[in-house]
Structure formats: C-alpha cells, structure tokens
Amino acid sequence: MALPDEAASCPSFFRQVTGGIFNQCTVMIFDAINLPQSDFQLALRAIEDCQEPRYQSDLDPVINAVTSRQREYIAGRVLARELLDRIGVNAQIIASGPKREPLWPTGIVGSISHNERSCAVVVAQNSVVTSVGIDIETIGRIDRHLWANLFTEEETEHLQQLEPAAQSRQATVLFSIKEAFYKYQYPITQGWVGFRDVSVHQEDASSYRLTAQISDATLASNVLALVEPVGADQVIALVVDQAVPKRLDIN
C-alpha cells in the first residue's frame, strides 16, 4: 500500500525508496549526513505498512491497549528491526524500559515516534553518535492554553507575534523539537527534563540550536535540531550531535 499523502510528499532530507525491505518507505538522504549508511539509518513509513513481520513480544506490552495503540507500537518495532538489520544488527526483540523507552541492543542508540498515520525511527551505532531523538507531530495539536506549560517566555512572545497559521505551525515545531531532545538526553542522564527547561533558538529555515537548564547543560549546546515538513500538516524533528548533519540551506 502506498505511503499516505503526508509521507509521499517527502521532507527535503528524505527520499522515497521502492524495493527491497524499504518498499514504500521514505529514508534519509545520506549526502545530508556525515555518517555512512552502515552506521546511521532513519526512515518514515505509514503505520499500516509496518505491521509485518511481527512477534508476540511486539504485542505483549500493549496487549490491553486499544487496537490503534497496538498498531502504532508494532509499527515502531517492525520498522526499527528493519533499520537495525541495515546496520548489521539482528534484534528480534526490542523491549520497553520502565519509562516506556525502547531498550536497544548493546552498542546501539535509537528513537521511535509515531502519530495516528506515520511512524519514524532512527538508529545508529553509539561509536559514531552520542544519542539520537526523533519526533513526528500533526500541526495544530498544541492548543494555545498549553503554551504556559510548554514554552519559555521568550518562545511564547515569539509565537504571539505570528499570524494564526504560522503560530500553529511554529508551536508544533517547538514542541516537536523538545520532545525529540527529551528522547536524545534520557539515555544519557536517565533524568526528567521539563519542556520549559529547554529553550529553542532558530538558526535557519530548518535547523535550531538548543539551551537547557539541566545538570549537564553541554548536552543541549552540543546538539542540532533539524525540522522538516511532512506534507502540509505534519512536521518531523530530528535531534542529533551537531557534527552529524552537513549544513543544508533548505528553503
């Protein structure tokens, strides 16, 4: 089955691949990444196309959940196994930790995100990156009444100056970056980071710098967040070590 419309319109640092295990899958363009494909893999795929091959271990953690939640969880594990295979790692089981975080094989860092339509996964050898974080969001889901809990005063002031459509998109972008950063930092610190503890600073059309009020503030200063549209109504945020992306002028 084809990718949904939002994934068929590929983000500019993605390309669509047809064939092999990546049938109907959108994966990273590797001339945008300073790492070989054997060390770093990222992909986006429709949830409905990530249901097989599945294992009982994919279902056990969500056995009592509603069907939609089961499908989302399974999609993350199915796609993650495919990407791990691409970097030479055979992992039948990707369990969940106490905070529902994926427990990756030794030597691997990774991140999984999904919404109601699509699943995004990034995996890498920990010899080439410190950590990774990914998040995909539907534009418009961050209601204005949530801003005080999510954004710094500076971020809120910036949002208030925007027109409604741009405001809705940028609020989603800021939220998505902070979600991706949380996933990046958690395997390192094993600690909680609040949304307002992280400040996001736009650098150009698609990249953002971060600062954070956490015990190891260098974690934020050493990363770069890349954000790209997925069709007309979604965004995907990737947080990686700042040395990983080649600098792109994406408009």
Where are these regions (language model features)?
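Core catalytic alpha/beta fold that binds nucleotide/phospho-ligands
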Residues: 2-132, 136-251
